[in-house]
Amino acid sequence: MPIKVLFCFVVLYTTWILKGNSQQVLQWRGTDRTGVFQESNLLKSWPEGGPALLWEFDGLGNGYSSPVITSTMIYVNGEVDTISYMFALDLSGKFLWKVEIGKEWTLSYPGSRSTPTIVDDLIYVTAGWGTVACLEAKTGKERWSIDMVKDFHGPINRFGFSESLLVEGDKVFCAPGGIDSNVVALDRFTGRIKWICKGLGEMTSYCSPQLIKLQARNIFVTFSKNALLGIDTKDGALLWSHKQDGNGDVHVNTPLFEDGYIYYITGDGSGSVKLKLSNDGTTITEVWKNSACDNTMGGFIKLDNYIYTASYGKRIWYIQDVTTGKLVDSIKFDKGTTNLADSLLYLYNEKGQMGIFKPVGPKMKMVSSFKITRGTKAHFAHPVICNGILYVRHGKSLLAYDIKEK
């Protein structure tokens, strides 16, 4: 091979490798889906009435999905007249454009569910009746779309397709929940099928999945109706499953992987569970299970040796020891979502109260709180913290609060 040609090949190959390794993913509950936002110099307490409201946008349509913020734009989807739209705003909350995604869920709790996933210059999102779409982030132009019901025989469930799509390399994953097409990997640039996993042949269960990266393999982790599934991202092989107690089918919370262990919480199954994952990722061993810890869709935060999460049955918040699985304390605060930023827990409950709490080992103490009075319908959406701004979606409204310490 001539030296010039060889040199050009090396430069192009190196550029491709660097581009692949620098892939920027903005998604549900932060960059790694743990609910932890890497922020600093945030307010340690709020004035009475809450932090300053920077702006409000009131035209989103119905929905419970969270916004995703880039360096220049904000993306969030909502339902208007039965259709799911992707909305684009600038960082001041000014409307830029909206584009149609597909038919949105309008039965039980009408509105968008799926938080968009943004990888470099492309957006991936799901609509409630099964559309999966790839859009150009700059203009909203559709690159491709598929229908999980028509194309993969996904059954219609009680609350609509809800997952926030997961991307790995050149693949985007979706869970139609069909008997023959349970989980599907698509080429994220073309929408063509990479592989199909039959799983256990069970209906999907509203979970936004997690990606576990090991030396031996990467594993796609999600829930079907009655089990947690671990699937090899390379070929779609089902590696293992963990059966749920009872007959519930709502397993919304994204699992967590840390230091060789998988943690998950479901209010409609086994409760809180810790699993040991083998080094090669092919087997799991149950460490403990606590059915009293029953968060349904508010997420949870693991900080050091403790998990902080809401109880959906008792409308309180639990602190759980991750070594033993025992509940070591609780506080009175209505059920809702939880995030962590700059060493403080951000709790947003279903009555509209937003609070910051200081976690101290097996305890947590409320520092400040205020009521979200703007917006419409249920307080379900998970807040987002980005560059010192707290973004709260409440139905048709997106609110931006200044929480940066001056």
What are these regions (language model features)?
Residues 1-24:
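Bacterial Sec-dependent N-terminal signal peptides
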Residues 30-33, 79-81, 128, 177-178, ...:
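Short loop/turn segments immediately following the C-termini of beta-strands
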Residues 270, 376-406:
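Blade-level signature of beta-propeller repeat domains, shared across WD40, Kelch, NHL, RCC1
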Residues 54-68, 83, 98-117, 145-167, ...:
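Extracytoplasmic beta-rich repeat domains
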Residues 23-52, 142:
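Blade/loop signatures of beta-propeller domains
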Residues 90-94, 136-139, 187-190, 232-236, ...:
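Short loop/turn segments that connect beta-strands within beta-propeller blades
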Residues 270, 292-359:
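Loop/turn-rich, solvent-exposed surfaces of beta-rich toroidal or solenoidal domains
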